[in-house]
UniProtKB/Swiss-Prot annotation:
One of its GO terms (biological process) is response to cadmium ion. The keyword Transmembrane applies. InterPro entries: ICMT_MeTrfase. This is Nickel-cobalt-cadmium resistance protein NccN. It comes from the Bacteria. Pfam families: ICMT.
Length: 213
């Protein structure tokens, strides 16, 4: 599956539109399934080097995702519907927020110390978000005439570091940024949930019905 897509000038397919409209609901279902598995299961890698590696990767992923989303919010807050943002993180790829989401989602999966749960979250993202990217590219191309040129030189998903550029000063819409702040740090909240489940398991408050690979 190639997430780095060409500019989506054509109208999105019915499936693309469905996934875009219902992505929050779909994610709630996926996350709920993962949480149920985490509550009722236990990592088979517990107290091994694999567990330590997964936890380290998870913490790095969540930290990078949180910082990255805050960086994106500085540039996009208050501008999303009024102008095409092409500097800062948006100079390296067209959808840096989704890049951060992917890194954070995989990080959260790794923090469960289960390769299976991390893979489920990564697969759900890979199946859903190419459609979301196509739909958003189509909308941006309709709203901003300069988008087509921007899309030709800027990858959709995988950042190209050599393209980075930014102004020496940048006006931040503080009110919009503050409203986006909660969305940018929700990974930290989910980290607390995952850690709380692990603490409850070590305290023998939760049953274990299955070992999670």
């Amino acid at each position: 599956m190639n997430i780095s897509l060409r500019p989506a000038i054509a109208a999105p397919s019915p499936l693309d539109s469905f996934l875009t409209r219902h992505r929050i609901g779909i994610w709630r279902v996926v996350v709920s399934v993962v949480l149920i598995a985490l509550i009722t299961g236990h990592s088979q890698w517990d107290d091994t080097w694999i567990s330590a590696a997964l936890l380290t990767v998870g913490m790095l992923g969540v930290t990078m995702a949180t910082v990255g989303r805050l960086w994106c919010a500085l540039y996009i807050s208050g501008r999303k519907s009024t102008e095409l943002v092409t500097t800062g993180p948006y100079s390296m790829c067209r959808h840096p927020l989704y890049v951060c989401n992917f890194v954070g989602i995989v990080g959260l999966g790794a923090m469960t110390e289960s390769i299976t749960l991390a893979a489920i979250l990564a697969l759900a993202f890979a199946l859903m978000y190419p459609a979301v990217i196509r739909s958003e590219d189509h909308l941006l191309s309709r709203n901003f005439p300069e988008f087509d040129d921007y899309a030709r030189r800027t990858p959709a998903f995988f950042p190209r570091l050599s393209l980075f550029r930014s102004e020496s000063t940048y006006l931040v819409h503080v009110g919009s940024f503050q409203r986006n702040l909660a969305d940018s740090v929700w990974f930290l909240g989910m980290t607390i949930v995952v850690n709380a489940v692990e603490l409850a398991r070590h305290a023998k408050w939760l049953p274990t019905f299955v070992l999670l690979p």
